């Protein structure tokens, strides 16, 4: 179908309006966490499953379908030999698009795709200054439940969690990751307390876990303390205590979600409590001209991006640990 120049302008204006709406919705979601921090735990549980998407797209998918478990494009499912069911509507996301521009005059740049025949010849001869810019367009993805993939094959596409009897083996993978990748030893110790389950020692870059912990709790606490080691080994003195705890809670919950943990109400309460304390501390600092105003999206993005940087390699360590355990069990 051919489009007239006026149609193209109209289409571009409509697309920009839709993009602006998505960007505004992302901001609204972040502001919603300000009003109800308890919902953050549900978001982190969700985001822990979607490390292949950017934090902003995670928010958009979460906003449109909080029960999504695995998403892919229409083409992705086709490439796997399946299809999206008829009548299903996609979930809108932001898709990065790189555009090459060339300099026409001092104050004017033009898309290479819109170059005239003469300009294309000059471009071949490299007579124009060029640069690349990144913009976004609207794309669609579909949850696996919207496709023809049978439920029994879902585990081929995403992890459905681990059995509790595997937690000790998963812990060994987490421990090896901390020690080999973060240079952070993980030790079981007598902490002379029943209530203290573990702590991160920033000046030694070391994790100590209470030796009385059973396997599942030991793994859960290790993931939280690993969050400190990842996010705070260099900035422990610079950040408020409430922010340090909130960030460790946040990334720890994302790791826990990835490994199949359900969140206890006490964890959700603690996360919301730390969030409110962090926000109140920031408001006080702003009043005293010591800080910039609090930006929830900035903190959420930092936590999510840090999680994305580590989860694949951490999963590799865990899988190696599980494989070793399986081999040793077969040899018995």
Regions found by a protein language model. Give the residues of each.
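N-terminal accessory/interface modules of nucleic-acid-binding and processing proteins
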Residues: 1-332
